[in-house]
């Protein structure tokens, strides 16, 4: 198996450190998840980005447990994240949801617990359907729940006080929501996770968040590639970034793969990345994106590919107004 040096880490505003390169658990299927997590740990990965909605936390936990049991890694050397799903935003459900996650992962705490989306939906009991996805218990109708974000955030702050989450963060938030949140919170978000790739660079949001000492993690670093298997028309109709001439030219110049260039475009600017791969060689390549530098001309050429093209758009699924 190919191995790579563990990713360097950056310090969060909570004082903890997060690796710049992690392993994403989105779309990691149940039949391979445990083995993939185990292999990733053996390859040098220490950050694992998960979520309640990914429906694989039990298997992820099995892979972690195996690696710890074999002495490959200690729990304190790992950085495990999860995300609060929309159904559990009510303050009485926040701890319940995290306890379910911790039970599935077989862990005492997570290193970072995000709010997955800045919108609350009608809750569904865990025993009825878990994870519920966008199901609200009323056929196919999506229903909003009247829960202010600040109430949800204060419930997350209590999780930190209880030692159930070392740090807390936000995902898919706009600058306006962040502006409002940091003026009413006691514990500041340590991180913002957003869709980020050359077709969607969101430069003003990135600048605003970094000015407030909030770490950014970019998901879907390869743009449409992450959404092709979902048969998403917007992704199918978009040129694949891994084959984009500018990206390929820069990759050839540096003797790297297009995937490594796309990841380095983010990490060189301080943005953490969470790619997923089933191939041991690509897993090692993805982790090895700190050992070369893109020039300013490279960075500018990649940035010029931006066309504000978002693929993860909940409005397309159920008219859910996250980004509209």
Curated annotation (Swiss-Prot):
Catalytic activity as recorded in UniProt: xylitol + NAD(+) = D-xylose + NADH + H(+); xylitol + NADP(+) = D-xylose + NADPH + H(+)
One Pfam family recorded for the sequence: Aldo_ket_red
InterPro entries (UniProt xref): AKR (IPR020471), AKR2B1 (IPR044486), Aldo/ket_reductase_CS (IPR018170), NADP_OxRdtase_dom (IPR023210), NADP_OxRdtase_dom_sf (IPR036812)
Residues at which NAD(+) binds: 220-286
Residue sites binding substrate per the record: 116
Keywords: Carbohydrate metabolism, NAD, Oxidoreductase, Xylose metabolism
Disulfide bonds: none
TM stretches of this protein: none
Enzyme Commission number, as recorded: 1.1.1.307
Keyword RNA-binding in record: no
GO molecular function (one): mRNA binding
Pathway the protein acts in: Carbohydrate metabolism; D-xylose degradation
Gene3D superfamilies hit by this protein: NADP-dependent oxidoreductase domain (3.20.20.100)
CDD domains for the chain: AKR_AKR2B1-10 (cd19113)
Broad enzyme group: oxidoreductase
A biological process from GO: cellular response to oxidative stress
Site note Lowers pKa of active site Tyr, residues: 83
Active site: 54
Family named by the database record: Belongs to the aldo/keto reductase family.
Function: Reduces D-xylose into xylitol. Preferentially utilizes NADH as a cosubstrate.
Protein name as catalogued: NADH-dependent D-xylose reductase
Organism of derivation: Candida parapsilosis
